[in-house]
Amino acid sequence: MKVGIISINKYSKHLNFGAALHSYAFQQYLDKQGIDNVIIDYLPRFMKTYNMKYPFLSEQPKEKIKRFFFWLGYFFPNLTRYKKFMNFFDTKYRMTNCQYDEALLSKALFDFDTIVCESDVIWSPHSTQGFDNGFFCNLPSMRGKNKISYAACIGYTNFSEKRQARFRELLKNFDSISVREIQGTEFTQEYTDKPVVNVLDPTLLLDAEDYAKIAVKPKEKHYLLVYN
């Protein structure tokens, strides 16, 4: 069996620790189970106009100058952070060689038996663009494959009637459904006849020894990083 993993990971606003770690952890867990897998290098619809390296360039034209001065103080720290994140993805992830957006992904010829939509807030509809089809396995290239959600998150649940209907329809794509939060599990169950299971965040599938293998001892001392 070969598994394709799709989620928010490499492309997230504000270079999120959680986004980087959950897909890493899930891939490592599958490796431990002897399951062949690869992370799909997927650029979500809502990130196509966002510049992770130079965030101020993502602003509307009238806001760019004002936001430039806001970001000026963060320019070099953000650039350093960006490079470290990209290095993590390049060295710790096993990803597809090609970057896919929704249009390209819909035409992809994958040899996956199973697609897993994995963790993070992948089921939250964008304010203007709605749900991302890639995160619901709602693309032609994914037809005929086993489709699973693992620890998916919805975020806010105040859907319009139109989006409620769309959410119900998109859930039909999945063969198995699991959600990260209890509230999200209960909410999702209202929109499908399939059982919805509440599961652990992927980062908790590994133990301390697994993370110790990739930890880099900091040069600086006397501080504490809290990952919540």
Which functions belong to the PLM regions below?
Residues 143-147, 175, 193-194:
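A short helix->loop->beta-strand "cap" motif at the edges of active sites that frequently abuts
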Residues 185-203:
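Helix-loop-beta element that forms the nucleotide-linked donor phosphate-binding surface
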